[in-house]
């Protein structure tokens, strides 16, 4: 009997487990379908917004979609809507969108909703509303934490109001009993560096030390960037020594900051010498390193060096991104090397990366001028297939091409 009972019990457990798996599988499929439906709706909304300038219509589109700041595409939707409204000077509509967004959230309201609104007000250059939203969090029954403080500092950065950022940093933590964290200090270092007061960032590092918060490579990277812009190279070396003292690894990301600064100052050869020195110390550059150098040499119209770096990059197993291709194609067209530009353009389009209409037109006309009309028409055909909205423009370009010889 005991044996039969165990068999029946096992059969019962197996049956229940099977039912649970089926139910769980059904639930997962339902969740996946819901997520897919949400993604499609959000992407359709984003597509609509990109072609809309009417403030009432923008508000209507946003309100008709259940937007969440926790979802990446929805954050883009809010950014596009706010930037468009601010560009057209529809500031009242910006307030209606963001304030309504917070107020209409179900209770308990999440701080993440307010954080997004604070940042977007800064992006719209409506910093007073960022501050007001931060101060009014109790009215919305939203907890105020260091996340809101960091969002307010970021809003100041976006509005480029460095004086207000300094006031927020000095006053708000004491006023609201908020303890700054690593992100707070890094934001303040960035404020000082962007405002041309990088030397003052040493005091922030000292404050971090007092609070037992260790600066990171990102903290020191901001300072290096700031000192490079101010051409204080002795200070750059000082920061590098500080990194060693704090036990912070000087990795390729730190060198990339220096390379970017040198390339922006039209010193790409110096940047390349720097990375050659790094490689001799057995530190490998990454794809960002090569992209920065390629962009730098292109901006100095040194195509030979740019193409050489591109070849080295690919041979070393790194994958160029779309911007790397676009930069090279533009510079090759500018230098009159349409044949090489065509090779890179084909590679780029195989990855579904198509340069801008103006660059593509430049390339097409350049090929035609070199008696490569067939190649030009082939390129037009591929672009027309991928981007149907520009078909009429490409038909005009194609009609103006000379007949093949």
From Swiss-Prot:
Pfam families: PPR_2. PPR repeats lie at residues 74-108, 110-144, 145-180, 181-215, 216-250, 251-285, 286-320, 321-355, 356-386. It comes from the Eukaryota. NCBIfam families: PPR (TIGR00756). This is Pentatricopeptide repeat-containing protein At1g11630, mitochondrial. It is found in: Mitochondrion. One of its GO terms (cellular component) is mitochondrion. It comes from Arabidopsis thaliana (Mouse-ear cress). Belongs to the PPR family. P subfamily. Keywords: Mitochondrion, Repeat, Transit peptide. Residues 1-72 form a transit peptide.
